[in-house]
Amino acid sequence: MITTERLHLRPWREEDKPVFHALANTPAMMEHFGGPVPQAKHDAIVDRMIDQQARNGHCMWVVEIRETGEMAGVCGLRIGGHPNTPVPEELEIGWRIGEKFWGQGIAREAAQASMAWGWANTDRPRIAAWTVIDNKPSWGLMKRLGMVRREDLDFRHPDYAEGDPFGAMIVYTIDRPA
């Protein structure tokens, strides 16, 4: 578990599935993912995170508010796992923070802690992040974290059909500190 001033970042548990679905499946939260989805799709995401934690020792962890234990969202690191893209095995940082917590610096606090963990616990030369071009809050955070746009690494996400605007990913990276 990672602890910050206001947050706990922890591995997933089976009982997180319905809580995550309720948090993440609103029209605003799913705006840049193509809209709300059935619970089974979010359950599959949680299953992948549990598997990644077991295999790699990290994943995009549950973000909890320390004071209340309430799930605020997701943030952490995973191995990209997108073959046939410019980022097939990148150490990816990502986040999804619930609407109730927007504008409070939760994503930044969780992302900074995740990046610090990544530098301390992996030998990766850089950390990458990607999102759709219209997701200005996400790439704005990437910039505030010190990440740099890498147009040479932009790609089509394999989970989206050709021509689907949600599949056009822009990439930011940050190099390991000296």
How does the language model describe each region?
Residues 1-31, 62-178:
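Acyl-donor (CoA/ACP) binding surface of acyl/acetyltransferases
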Residues 28-50, 58-61:
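Conserved GNAT-fold acetyl-CoA-binding loop/helix
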Residues 42-52, 120-128:
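Short, charged, low-hydrophobicity "junction" segments
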